[in-house]
């Protein structure tokens, strides 16, 4: 099972591959059986594969499909949290009824009560330069998840992905779960509610980069568009911290946890290794003053084709490439003084 991981590691070391994608579609067994993916090795042995990637120091990601038959609101939330809890970057796609696919058959449509909307096929061509557009039948409702629930799941996933997968609230959420303040599911249900109803920078990005697409059922595009992370992380970082401080005020947590949470995600305005003093030892979870040294890691990296193209441009500065490559990745902290 590890042979293709070893090959991927060679490609990564040669700077040909930025990360290995381990596609799983869903963590829900019933859903995988209904779409005939229950025998996929990666789905069954997901932990083995990610542990092997970590052992080889190989960045990795996965893919999931939202809208498969059998998937409910609860199973989707549990499955997605199971994936991101393990630190895996995850591309998410809406389910489409493609010509010739068994899922698109008349029998499947009737049995699974599939409803669809015609949506522009994502990634085929930029309509600005190619006037002929291609459309697909994108699933927007099933027997297990109605139209409103599915749209809500894409919004919930956008917020949860922002917080945990893109690391804006990962340490905050982990601390709350570890200390029995609130589990990850409850935390991100509240985070979604906060973003949707607040008036800060996170709500503005939510409206500009999610809602304007989900209102048109462009679910895949809504989650594939991750370019906003650059400005949110590098340019609007202080506004994000202010938002997170307001959100976190409802929890009984150490005063500087939000600062530690922020330092645990790559910053483009500091030089690493970077040292910060805290009143609490978050590394060892001990109530004592410490100084923590943060260094970069590649973990949590998520890239798009545009990002890969930038890495090969000769007229783009190395510093800019570096920041683009590391944006929203996790840092590693170690105690240097206590």
Predicted regions and their residues:
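Generic recognition of stable, solvent-exposed alpha-helical segments in well-folded globular domains
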Residues: 3, 41-48, 71-78, 145-155
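Short, electropositive alpha-helical surface patch
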Residues: 8-11, 72-88, 151-158
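A generic secondary-structure signal for well-formed alpha-helical elements
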Residues: 57, 87-90, 94, 160-164
